[in-house]
């Protein structure tokens, strides 16, 4: 198996050159989420549970953003292999129009009916009242985030992974500073509490959008052809919908599944402790997965570009095998490191910092151990689904393999243990991670067939 790791000189330098900035970008983004959680936790566990519940529908918006972004990257990475700037501009134009429409409507719903939506997600009305002001504003921020994320995705697919890292570093510093000022009322500003976190995020997203707009006009690496951007044509719309709509549905269904896990925890007898522990460990788990997300995104760029360049079927297969084995080994190393930190750092230092004591700390420990043990499985499935299958244009199977195990295994098993059997939280934590046990072998079987390799830039003639 390790024989496949032998590659031409410079390959791993190139791989890490793509992975590093993307991983740092994800680290910055997840650190922002962690800082949000930390500052809100200082207000109390009830406030943190309210924000966690409010973020359930927001996570669906994030999933839509990521879905459109991923659909765009499929086309851009392969067109970049051909250096076809006109079609790249058309693809970005279609993505911007569709993405705006897909985020404006849910953002409006969240703004108009925040309490009613919150009441659907928890049996605790106090959380709904506390979280509503946050929910009203945070939805609007993702309209701007959609547009900036699309431009970042296009730059990344054109092998410029550093742009997103710099943009989100700037945004994170701004957001964190505004969080501190507006949540706690520093420097003469009003103490807005939870609502302050939403205002800070909205202002940071608007700034991101402004910077991306300026760079899109001035960029030499990826010069957008504005005529093609504003008039992308029906052929590009058809092609984008064909390859991106399954990805958008995939991410939306996956996001809904993750949101349902939070809803299940919100209906347990100890919902405040469950939600508080899940909020903290959700962010900490993602911090350890940033390298895996980076490798997955780098895999998508490399595979997509290779197909666009016209490499042979066997070359692409060998390349995918190398990338997947390497990612799984990196995941195993991260598991060893993270498990060492549970008794030495998380339990004695991190959990008290987030005001997690007693039952909340015990639940967080269970979520930490089960989550960290699953990192190699998550690492493989991230690269398999978002890197190999999607970049190869195999969007139907990538959707089925990503969503199926979650909805058919993890969700019903977690609901059964948490709500019906009232099982111990260790069993519930294990059930949350169970989808990867099914996803990994199914992904491996699909990739082994080689039927996932498609050149999505080729226009088929009528009658063919």
Whereabouts are the PLM-identified features?
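Small-residue-rich hydrophobic transmembrane alpha-helices
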Residues: 48-108, 145-164, 275-342, 379-398
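Helix-terminus/linker motif at the lipid-water interface of multi-pass membrane proteins
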Residues: 27-49, 118-125, 181-192, 252-287, ...
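Short runs within selected transmembrane alpha-helices of multi-pass transporters and secretion channels
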Residues: 69, 73, 138-157, 164-172, ...
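Short alpha-helical transmembrane segments in multi-pass integral membrane proteins
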Residues: 1-22, 76-141, 189-245, 303-374, ...
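Transmembrane alpha-helix boundary and packing residues in multipass membrane permease domains
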Residues: 22, 26, 37-38, 74, ...
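Alpha-helical transmembrane segments and their lipid-water interface positions
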Residues: 29, 33-36, 40, 62-69, ...
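Transmembrane helical elements of multi-pass membrane transporters/channels
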Residues: 17-36, 137, 171, 204-208, ...
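N-terminal transmembrane alpha-helices
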Residues: 7-38, 42-43, 59-71, 75, ...
């Amino acid at each position: 198996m390790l024989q496949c790791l032998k590659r031409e000189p410079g390959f791993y330098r190139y791989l890490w050159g793509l992975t590093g900035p993307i991983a740092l970008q994800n680290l910055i983004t997840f650190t922002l989420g962690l800082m949000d959680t930390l500052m809100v936790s200082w207000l109390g566990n009830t406030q943190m549970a309210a924000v966690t519940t409010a973020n359930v529908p927001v996570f669906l918006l994030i999933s839509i953003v990521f879905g459109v972004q991923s659909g765009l990257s499929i086309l851009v990475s392969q067109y970049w292999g051909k250096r076809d700037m006109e079609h790249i501009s058309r693809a970005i134009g279609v993505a911007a129009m569709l993405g705006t429409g897909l985020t404006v409507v849910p953002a409006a719903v969240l703004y108009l009916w925040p309490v009613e939506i919150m009441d659907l997600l928890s049996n605790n009305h106090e959380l709904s009242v506390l979280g509503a002001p946050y929910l009203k504003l945070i939805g609007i921020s993702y309209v701007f985030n959609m547009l900036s994320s699309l431009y970042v995705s296009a730059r990344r697919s054109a092998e410029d992974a550093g742009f997103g890292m710099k943009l989100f570093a700037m945004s994170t510093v701004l957001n964190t500073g505004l969080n501190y000022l507006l949540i706690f009322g520093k420097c003469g500003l009003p103490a807005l509490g939870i609502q302050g976190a939403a205002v800070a995020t909205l202002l940071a997203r608007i700034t991101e959008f402004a910077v991306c707009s300026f760079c899109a006009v001035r960029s030499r690496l990826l010069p957008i052809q504005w005529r093609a951007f504003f008039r992308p044509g029906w052929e590009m719309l058809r092609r984008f919908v064909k390859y991106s709509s399954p990805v958008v549905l995939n991410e939306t269904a996956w996001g809904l599944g993750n949101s349902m896990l939070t809803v299940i925890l919100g209906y347990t007898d100890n919902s405040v402790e469950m939600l508080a522990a899940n909020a903290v460990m959700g962010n900490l788990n993602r911090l350890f997965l940033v390298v895996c997300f980076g490798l997955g995104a780098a895999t998508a760029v490399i595979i997509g570009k290779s197909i666009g360049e016209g490499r042979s079927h066997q070359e692409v297969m060998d390349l995918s095998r190398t990338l997947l084995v390497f990612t799984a080994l990196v995941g195993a190393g991260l598991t060893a490191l993270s498990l060492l930190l549970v008794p030495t750092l998380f339990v004695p230092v991190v959990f008290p910092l987030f005001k997690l004591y007693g039952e909340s700390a015990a639940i967080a420990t269970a979520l930490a151990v089960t989550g960290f043990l699953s990192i190699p499985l998550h690492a493989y499935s991230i690269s398999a689904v978002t890197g190999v299958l999607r970049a190869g244009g195999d969007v139907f199977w990538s959707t089925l393999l990503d969503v199926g195990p979650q909805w058919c295994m993890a969700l019903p098993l977690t609901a059964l243990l948490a709500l019906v059997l009232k099982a111990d939280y260790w069993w519930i934590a294990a059930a949350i991670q169970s989808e990867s046990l099914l996803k990994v072998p199914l992904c491996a079987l699909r990739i082994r067939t080689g039927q996932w390799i498609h050149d999505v830039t080729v226009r088929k003639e009528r009658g063919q």
